[in-house]
Each structure stands twice: as structure tokens, then as C-alpha cells.
Amino acid sequence: MRYSSYEMKKNRFTYGLALGALGVVFGDIGTSPLYALKVTLSGIPINQFNILGVLSLIFWSLIIVVSFKYLMIIFRADNDGEGGILALLALMKHKSTKYQPLFYIVAIFGAGLLLGDGMLTPAISVVSAVEGLGTLSDKLYPYVLPIASVILVLLFSLQAKGTARIGYLFGPLILIWFITIAILGILQIVEHPVVLQAINPYYAIAFLVDEGLRGYFLLGGIFLVVTGGEALFADIGHFGKNPIRFSWFFIALPCLLLNYFGQGANLIVRPEEISNPFFMIAPPWFYLPLIIIATVATVIASQAVISATFSLTKQAVLLGLCPKIPIVQTSMLHSGQIYVPQINFILFIGTMAFCLAFKTSDNLAHAYGIAVNLEMLLVDAMVAYAAVSIWRWSTFNVIFLFGLFLLIDLAFLGANTHKFITGGWVPIVLAFVIAFIMYSWRYGLEYLRDNFYMNKEDISKILKQLQYKSLNQLPGVSAIFITDVYDKSGGSFLHFLKLNRSVPENVLIVNYIVDNIPYVHYSQRYEIVCLDEKVCKLVIHYGFMETINIPRSLEKACNKNILPFKFNVDTATFMVEIPNIMASKEKRSLSFYWQEKLFAFLMRNYSANLNIEFYKLPYNRTIAIGTYCIL
């Protein structure tokens, strides 16, 4: 669900926005109590000293990493109300510096890490919830994985339907989840209030000193309580800063702390219940309802991660970082409701592979977190640069503050390194693959623009050379020539002239530009240049969160009398150019021959039909003009 940009820009607060944020933003971090404390305490003696030390680390991690770093500092780095690593990249593009190529690499690698996280989060969340069946009977344990698999299959198969009809329920359902886990925690804390001493950071420091190297590596388990914190920044554009802050400080944070402390209080007197400390703090009669509530909460958390991945993909496509893969709008009312079939399939295969390979939430936890940790580090570095170059903070303040953040994240990363060999390598390798594909695509488009289109003569000169007015006219015919991002010279129109030696009565050459802001105001939408009496070049500006719809934009332009001539968009013919890219061993355009082959493959498979779909052109009135390019 997306709310109006006016609300976002004014940071308007409503309880509806806060409730919506609760359902989408905090699902991931909100379901961490299912497994985080169990994983952290496994393998060490379950005694009061260790429990207080771990609880103190959890408390201060949530305060420093989420409450202070993300909600107070990182939130400042929004791009016109939009958050996330690609929005941050677009913000950096406002400052043209020598570091811009580095920012591209950092951002696309971070995007790849988030895609890897999108595979692991549904797996560990749903499996950990269904594992609650073991509290009902040991005989139900063999059914945990099949039931979790069925839930995940249904979750991914229903993505094409969208969440418009049930999305409004996410907030109230997650609110029920938070209230439930808070009450369960309070019941235990009242009986054993000694756990409240863990608020004192002394216990965290004493625990790390006493446990030494083993205690340090337990930070990998502690990090699980802040996974999902990155979603707070990514979802600024959906709900705004103030509703997210309100939901965190008044609902999510207190409820999470109460539950973690409640689990700890129970373990102090019943250390044998470490096998499933979350479900064991509930009375036996509440096991089944709690399993149902937990499963619903984890499905919502998984849905939020999947939707965020779709949104990230759309940003990458519009910013020209990846091919124009099919993006389906699942709601006519909310532009944020989208479905990306190919990404959904990749996430599904990855999630099911993790489930079947690791089988339990404990095993999944040994692979989970390192990708999120790396992504947080990358965001820290980019925001630190923004603080110096855009916010004009003093170098000393930036070094002190972000030095602290980097030190904490590096400490977590060091503790998470062992996860690389226990499955954490999968999302990291996937991130490298995705980053390389994005890099090859971006570099290939730039090469195509600079070597095949940039050097073309000005269209007005070519029109004179061809004696445009003496060419055969097609009276009553209006043609719209669409040029891609790499083509600023009207290649489709020029190829049409050379092939036909005749011209439509009205010619409009359309080029679109995705600006480095999420939404473009109507007053800045159009730029028009008249090349001849009946030939115009129109540039349409979009934001990186908008849906490109050329016919709709042209219809609005006609209604506002922006164009010097009249034509009917509903009867006009659209022309698109489809380049056929071939890799050549004789000359080297990109870094490697197989990189050229990859770019050529992507261009061949994501140009013709997908260009027509991407621009929302009518198939029955669109003509594709082929051209041949050898790299």
C-alpha cells in the first residue's frame, strides 16, 4: 500500500499510517523472537549470568543499531521521501564526483544482498513458527518441514494475485502479534523481575569479557535481533518517517524487549526449555493459538520482504541498472502493488532450496544474517559520504559517529564470518552474480550509447539532407517514435526514414528520462523541441518509483496542448527500435568476451516484446524496427 506523496513529504502522521507501517515494516524484525534467543544461547551454559549478558546485548543492539542509527541518522538520507540503497544511489548522483562509479558498484552489490536476504527470511521465519508444533507433541516434528513447505508454496504462488484485497489486514494482525508476545513476556518478568537488571550495559560488557572469543562469536546470534532493521529505511517512501518512528518506539520496541526479557526470565528457572524458549513461555492451553498467530505473522513478514524485493527490482529497472524484465501491476489504485514473475520464481526456488537443505530454524540461522550485515555496512558508508558532501557535516563529527557505526557493524560481521561456510555463502555469491549482471548491463548500455548513437548527426541536419519536405507524405497518419535510454538521437525515426523514404504527416520522437527523484511534478514532466513544422522531439521525465506509461503521458500532453500539432493517441502508430547485439572476438568493447555475450543475450531477450510492455504500448499499433550492432 502506498500513500500520497504529499503525506510523505510533509511527514504527516496518522494512526492509520502507523498501523500500516507496523504490518509491513516490522514484520521481519518482529518475528525474530521466534529463534534469536534460542540460537544465541545454544552451546553455552544456561545460567543467570549468561542470560543477563545476552539480554543486555540484545537491549543495547536494538537501541543503538535500530533506534539511534537507523531511525535518527540513516533516516536523514532519504531521497525526496524515498529510502533504500538504490534511492540512496540516486541521491548520490546529484553530486557528480569521481566516486560515482564506486557508488554504482556498492549499490548494485547491496541490491544483490537484499535479494539473497529475500530468500532466507521467508524460510527461517515460516519454519521457526511451524516448529511450535513440537510443543504440542514430539510426534508432530516430522511434519514441520512439509507444512512449512506447503505454506511457502502457497505464498509464492499467490503473488500474482497481489495483496490489495488483504493488505489492509497486515497492520492489525501484526499488532495482535506484538500485543501477544508482550503479554507472554510480562507474565514471566513479573515472576522473575531480576532480568530487568540486563538494561545495565555492565552485564553485556562483563559477559563478553568473561566468555572471550566464544562470547564474541555469539554476537552472530545477537545480530539476528536487528535483522529486518534495514527494512525501516527501505520503507520510508511507503509510510513516512514519523509513522515508522511512532510504531517502533511505542509498539514494536517495547513488545520485542518484553518478550526477549520474558524468555530470559523463564530460562533462568527452567534452563531445560532452551529447545524452544519462545513457545515455552506460553501456557500449554495457548500453544495452538500461538502457533497459528506466529505462522500468520511470519507469512506477513515474508510477504513484506517479497514485496520489498519487487519494489527494489522496479527501481533497478527504471534507473537502468538491469534489463526491462516484466513487471505486472496488481492493483489499479496503488502503484506500489506490483508483481515481478521472474524475481518471484528465483525467490521461490531459493527459499525452497534453503528449507529443504537446512530443514530447521537452527540450521537456517547459521546461514542467516551475514548478507544483511554486509548491506548495513554498505549503507553506512554511503550515508557517511552523504553526511560530508550533501549535509555538510564536519569531518570530525562524521568520523566519530559513523566510525562508531562501522565499528559495531564490523564487530557483528566478524562474528558472522563463520556463517559463510555454513550456508551464508549462498546469498553472497548470488549478490556477486546479480551485481555483475547489473554492471554488465549498465556498462553495455553506456557503450552502445557512446559508440552507436552519440556520434549521429543532429536530426534537424539529417532532415535537411534528406530534403524532408519533398519526401512522400502520409496524410492523416501520426507516428510516435520511441527511443530508448541509450539513444538520444532518434534512431528509430532515422532508420524509418532510410527504409521508407516517406514520412507520416505528424511525427513525434519520444524519449524518456528517469530522474534521480522518486516522483516528478507535472510542471517538470515534459520538454519539447520542434525540429520541423510537423516533427517534434518530446522528452518525458519520470521518477524512479513511477510506472512508465508512454500513451498515458502523451494523452495528458495532448489534453494540456503541450504539442504544436493535434493527433489522436488512440489511433497513432508507435515505432520502437530493437537492436540486435552481436559479440565480436576481433574487437573488445566490454572487459571480457563472455561479458559481451551476456550483454548481447540480455538485449536480445529483453528488448522486443518487453520494450512494448515496458512502455505500455498497444501491440496492434506498434511496429518494431530492427538494427544491427557489433560490439
Curated annotation (Swiss-Prot):
Topology in the lipid bilayer: Multi-pass membrane protein
Transmembrane segments: 17-37, 55-75, 101-121, 140-160, 166-186, 217-237, 249-269, 277-297, 338-358, 370-390, 395-415, 420-440
Molecular-function GO terms, alphabetical: potassium ion transmembrane transporter activity; symporter activity
Catalysed transformations (reactions): K(+)(in) + H(+)(in) = K(+)(out) + H(+)(out)
Keyword Cell membrane: yes
A Gene Ontology cellular-component term: plasma membrane
UniProt keyword list: Cell inner membrane, Cell membrane, Ion transport, Membrane, Potassium, Potassium transport, Symport, Transmembrane, Transmembrane helix, Transport
Localization annotation: Cell inner membrane
Main location: membrane
Family named by the database record: Belongs to the HAK/KUP transporter (TC 2.A.72) family.
Function in brief: Transport of potassium into the cell. Likely operates as a K(+):H(+) symporter.
Name the record gives this protein: Probable potassium transport system protein Kup 1
Gene that produces this protein: kup1
